[in-house]
């Protein structure tokens, strides 16, 4: 809200220097500083409160006694995603143009999935049910958020000009149109029949993939910080007419305001990493993982760059794929031979490397490096076409 207040004062009294508040880059920097400050400042108190409430991580017996022992992590405060949500929400509300459709939709997507994650963490930590929220309820919450995001992106007037189009990597002057019914010329708008399921799938898949990645100290936090840095560049370029023309990508008026939101996400991740880095003094839990997945998924959809996701978020993709491959192959071999076999020693992928003897800090660092490289590659694709 400070943005509107300072802008009002500038228009009314014209004090020197106040006009800089209209620059997105300035507000993105201020949002970053604010989010980082909230995460670092409030983090210690929130962690202390979580510990007092005995909202600690529950380690399954198999994890405590198996080849990979996480017994030492039992009791570490979880639900730390509250820190991330407060940091991003506070910074964006202060410095963002919250009336902008892109901004409030991002906040709703992140907050909505954060609520779903909080419910899951609550069942685990307060009710002491290790499996957490019923899987169907969890998926229903993710689908509901996805449907809301998809409906706004398709039916809201601000998106009418390009509601079913998306960027195609490597191909110049080409876009993908999700409206597969357009060529039929029926005179009836049926594009939503394809677009809404696509949005629901992406929001659900990304949030689950981020959640699967959250298994080692600092892994999801660091990976998402790098992914968010890439998104900062994507949203700023998409909202800037000159840069969009130079890079020959779709110019999406208004998306520049998302820079403030994504910058806050990036800074909040770095602030949370202060406490979540190895050895972690707090875990984000599903509260943070699903919220970050909602932020990444909704943002990439809004700037029409979702086809870059497998590269931009390659660690998320690899973690989710490892679980799918492991589960599918185990069921297939058990049905064929009576004995289930595994492709990986453990899944998700980070546990496979743990089982091979790599220290979790080394695994985390290498996954960060891989993410940094693929984020740079994804940004280069904007130019190399």
Swiss-Prot record:
GO MF term set: metal ion binding; phospho-N-acetylmuramoyl-pentapeptide-transferase activity; UDP-N-acetylmuramoyl-L-alanyl-D-glutamyl-meso-2,6-diaminopimelyl-D-alanyl-D-alanine:undecaprenyl-phosphate transferase activity
One Pfam family cited in the UniProt record for this chain: MraY_sig1
Cellular localization per UniProt: Cell inner membrane
CC cofactor: Mg(2+)
Biological or metabolic pathway of the protein: Cell wall biogenesis; peptidoglycan biosynthesis
GO terms under cellular component: plasma membrane
Record flagged with keyword Cell wall biogenesis/degradation: yes
UniProt keywords, alphabetically: Cell cycle, Cell division, Cell inner membrane, Cell membrane, Cell shape, Cell wall biogenesis/degradation, Magnesium, Membrane, Metal-binding, Peptidoglycan synthesis, Transferase, Transmembrane, Transmembrane helix
Principal localisation: membrane
PROSITE patterns found in the cross-reference section: MRAY_1 (PS01347), MRAY_2 (PS01348)
EC number: 2.7.8.13
GO biological processes: cell division; cell wall organization; peptidoglycan biosynthetic process; regulation of cell shape
Membrane topology designation: Multi-pass membrane protein
Catalytic activity: UDP-N-acetyl-alpha-D-muramoyl-L-alanyl-gamma-D-glutamyl-meso-2,6-diaminopimeloyl-D-alanyl-D-alanine + di-trans,octa-cis-undecaprenyl phosphate = di-trans,octa-cis-undecaprenyl diphospho-N-acetyl-alpha-D-muramoyl-L-alanyl-D-glutamyl-meso-2,6-diaminopimeloyl-D-alanyl-D-alanine + UMP
Bilayer-spanning residue ranges: 23-43, 79-99, 103-123, 135-155, 186-206, 218-238, 258-278, 282-302, 307-327, 362-382
Family from the record: Belongs to the glycosyltransferase 4 family. MraY subfamily.
HAMAP family per UniProt: MraY (MF_00038)
Function comment: Catalyzes the initial step of the lipid cycle reactions in the biosynthesis of the cell wall peptidoglycan: transfers peptidoglycan precursor phospho-MurNAc-pentapeptide from UDP-MurNAc-pentapeptide onto the lipid carrier undecaprenyl phosphate, yielding undecaprenyl-pyrophosphoryl-MurNAc-pentapeptide, known as lipid I.
Entry-linked NCBIfam families: mraY
Protein's name in the database: Phospho-N-acetylmuramoyl-pentapeptide-transferase
Species per Swiss-Prot/TrEMBL record: Salinibacter ruber (strain DSM 13855 / M31)
Organism lineage string: Bacteria, Pseudomonadati, Rhodothermota, Rhodothermia, Rhodothermales
